[in-house]
């Protein structure tokens, strides 16, 4: 199998990629610093960030496939990344309570051997339940929201805050597996070889 490198420190992305290709990859965290760029819309921004992460990590390798991603939640015209404090998480949850939000992941797959690069985004509609102040406080105090875009983990306790989704569930977690699997197959990484 060809070398695959995940350009992410996210334990969730690592777990998701292992669902597709087992543990046949290495992790190399990008040193690229994400900054908001006013001239870009949210979709362009997450794609740009994922591309810059992939390019940064590619400098450390001679061959292989680099996978990078950037996920945000978009609500009422605002980009919600990861909350930095408990109060910030509380404010985000109050903002998205009872609303439909978008989980948007920019993803780059860079084949260093062929030079092929796919950079695109995947969106998933997420309908949040109307949350009480007590629910928000309890969830925030659990600590789970702190390293999650939009301050909720659909794959954890935050699942009870989500009424429904339309789109790729794994995209909300941080890596759109359907689209990623398709691209990897196109690049010669067989998902079903070991089945």
Swiss-Prot record:
It comes from the Archaea. It catalyses: dTTP + H2O = dTMP + diphosphate + H(+); UTP + H2O = UMP + diphosphate + H(+). It holds the Pfam family Maf. It is found in: Cytoplasm. Its cofactor is a divalent metal cation. One of its GO terms (molecular function) is UTP diphosphatase activity. Its main location: cytoplasm. The record marks 12, 71, 155 as: Important for substrate specificity. Belongs to the Maf family. YhdE subfamily. Nucleoside triphosphate pyrophosphatase that hydrolyzes dTTP and UTP. May have a dual role in cell division arrest and in preventing the incorporation of modified nucleotides into cellular nucleic acids. CDD domains: Maf. InterPro entries: ITPase-like_fam (IPR029001), Maf-like (IPR003697). The keyword Hydrolase applies. One of its GO terms (cellular component) is cytoplasm. Disulfide bonds: none annotated. The active site is at 70 (proton acceptor). SUPFAM superfamilies: ITPase-like. Keywords: Cytoplasm, Hydrolase, Nucleotide metabolism. This is dTTP/UTP pyrophosphatase. Its EC number is 3.6.1.9. One of its GO terms (biological process) is nucleotide metabolic process.
């Amino acid at each position: 199998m060809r070398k695959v490198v995940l350009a992410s420190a996210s334990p969730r992305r690592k777990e998701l990629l292992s669902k597709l290709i087992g543990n046949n990859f290495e992790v190399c965290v990008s040193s690229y610093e994400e900054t908001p760029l006013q001239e870009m819309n949210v979709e362009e921004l997450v794609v740009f960030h994922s591309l810059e992460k992939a390019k940064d990590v590619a400098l450390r390798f001679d061959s292989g496939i680099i996978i990078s991603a950037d996920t945000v939640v978009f609500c009422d015209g605002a980009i919600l990344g990861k909350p930095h404090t408990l109060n910030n998480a509380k404010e985000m949850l109050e903002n998205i309570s009872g609303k439909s939000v978008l989980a948007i992941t920019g993803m780059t797959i860079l084949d260093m051997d062929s030079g092929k690069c796919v950079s695109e985004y995947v969106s998933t509609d997420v309908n949040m339940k109307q949350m009480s102040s007590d629910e928000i406080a309890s969830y925030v105090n659990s600590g789970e929201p702190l390293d999650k875009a939009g301050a909720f983990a659909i794959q954890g306790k935050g699942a009870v805050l989500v009424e429904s989704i339309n789109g790729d569930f794994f995209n909300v977690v941080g890596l759109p597996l359907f689209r990623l699997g398709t691209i990897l197959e196109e690049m010669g990484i067989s998902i079903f070889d070991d089945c």
